[in-house]
C-alpha cells in the first residue's frame, strides 16, 4: 500500500504561520492535511511542545514541518520531537516555499522535498531595486 502524502505543518512565533496558511489557501483553495501551530505570546514552551507532539501524532508522524526560524522555541520543540520520530522539514518558511512544498509533496520523499523547497526558495529571493527604478522611469515617462 502506497503511503499517503505527508501532512504539512507550519509552525512559527505568533500568528504568522496561521496567516501564511490562509494566504496559500487563496492560491490553492482548501488544502487537505495542512495545519498551522502558532506559538502565542506568553505561552509556556512546554505547552507548545506538547501541542506540537499531539499534532504530529495525529498524522502518525507522517508530517513535513515548515518552521519560521532556526533556534527559536518552535524550532527547538520540533528538534525535541525529532528525537523520537523521523521528521523532515525546512526553516525560513515563506509563501513561495509553502507553495513549492504543497506542489511537490505527492511526488517526493521528505528529504527530497526539503532539498527542493530550500533550493527553489534561494532562487526566489531577489533585489528588486533595478526593477523598481525601471518602473519609476516608466511612470515618469522616460
Functional labels for PLM-detected ranges:
Residues 1-66, 70-142:
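N-terminal loops that bind phosphate or other acidic moieties
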Amino acid at each position: 500500500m502506497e503511503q499517503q502524502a505527508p501532512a504539512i505543518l507550519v509552525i512559527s512565533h505568533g500568528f504568522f504561520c496561521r496567516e501564511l496558511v490562509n494566504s496559500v489557501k487563496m492560491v490553492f483553495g482548501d488544502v487537505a492535511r495542512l495545519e498551522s501551530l502558532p506559538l502565542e505570546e506568553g505561552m509556556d514552551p512546554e505547552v507548545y511542545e506538547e501541542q506540537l507532539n499531539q499534532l504530529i501524532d495525529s498524522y502518525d508522524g507522517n508530517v513535513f514541518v515548515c518552521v519560521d526560524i532556526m533556534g527559536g522555541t518552535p524550532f527547538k520543540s520540533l528538534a525535541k520531537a525529532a528525537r523520537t520520530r523521523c521528521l523532515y522539514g525546512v526553516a525560513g518558511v515563506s509563501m513561495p516555499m509553502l507553495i513549492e512544498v504543497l506542489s511537490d509533496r505527492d511526488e517526493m520523499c521528505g528529504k527530497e522535498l526539503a532539498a527542493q523547497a530550500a533550493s527553489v526558495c534561494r532562487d526566489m529571493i531577489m533585489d528588486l531595486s533595478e526593477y523598481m527604478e525601471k518602473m519609476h522611469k516608466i511612470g515618469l515617462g522616460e
